[in-house]
Amino acid sequence: MLENYKHTTVLLDEAVNGLNIRSGGIYIDGTFGRGGHSRLILSQLGPEGRLLAIDRDPQAIEAAKAIDDSRFSIIHGPFSAMADYVAELGLTGQIDGVLLDLGVSSPQLDDPERGFSFMRDGPLDMRMDPTRGSSAAEWLMKAEADDIVWVLKTFGEERFAKRIARAIVERNRTEPMTRTKELASLIAAASPIREKHKHPATRSFQAIRIYINSELEEIERALEGALSVLAPQGRLSVISFHSLEDRIVKRFIRHQSRGPQVPAGLPLTEEQLRSQGGQTLKPVGKKLMPSEAEVAENPRARSSVLRFAERLPA
């Protein structure tokens, strides 16, 4: 069933090239997905190189079985626990590069049984790991209207959040929603104005998905984890797909690259400043966006942003 859902890896070459792969290095693909980035990394590693992949989606773990390579291993779990996985392997501070491809994948969106898409009818689930936590239907059934409003506004910037939340609560009082099409139709009916070329449920589905999977908190923890496992000169390569994700990545790199704030004019070298603590990363190059050709081939790449950073010596 896995092969039925095609996945085109976004910014494939750019994201991997930014890792500056060393033949004998140790790398982490924190979001295996269907293995596009992992396969390219493996193709650039020598016999002594190693690649550790992570994914919390059981279908991704199943897809990884197709990679028969002694240099490769995969862990089923959230990338936010990266530091723990690496510590268990005794490799803290020895990782030469970490790649993160954030958000929901095409196979997750395209499989109606996963419940991520308002375009295809399926169970109202939305969990990246269906074996853990509450589904979207379960959460919506027990959530108060104010809680739903907060989620829709915070993670979806939905201006009709109150109308939609009220409609959800009223519907669930009479007959619980269990299908994606039910929720999408309800949101469309509750939205008085429609944006051109945008389904009324787009923002709400994004918001509920982000909340159900704790996506933004997971990203923050994953970035901290990457920082803790990287070796000096190790690279961080992160692809984000919407402004909420990119804002977290941008702020993290900026904060970690600023270092201690000291009065201007103090005669301190860069090494002395680093010894004060705080400056741990330096940005590498400018953010990258997909080319027009890539967007034409894969419209879902349109909103992607790729950022790089390099670990500074302690």
UniProtKB/Swiss-Prot annotation:
Residues involved in S-adenosyl-L-methionine binding: G35, G36, H37, D55, F79, D101, Q108
Catalyzed reaction equations: cytidine(1402) in 16S rRNA + S-adenosyl-L-methionine = N(4)-methylcytidine(1402) in 16S rRNA + S-adenosyl-L-homocysteine + H(+)
The UniProt record lists the EC number as: 2.1.1.199
Does the record bear Cytoplasm in its keywords?
yes
Tell me which GO cellular component terms the UniProt record holds: cytoplasm
- InterPro entries linked: RsmH, SAM-dep_MeTrfase_MraW_recog, SAM-dependent_MTases_sf
List localization entries.
Cytoplasm
Q: What is its main location?
A: cytoplasm
| Function per UniProt | Specifically methylates the N4 position of cytidine in position 1402 (C1402) of 16S rRNA.
Protein's name according to its UniProt entry:
Ribosomal RNA small subunit methyltransferase H
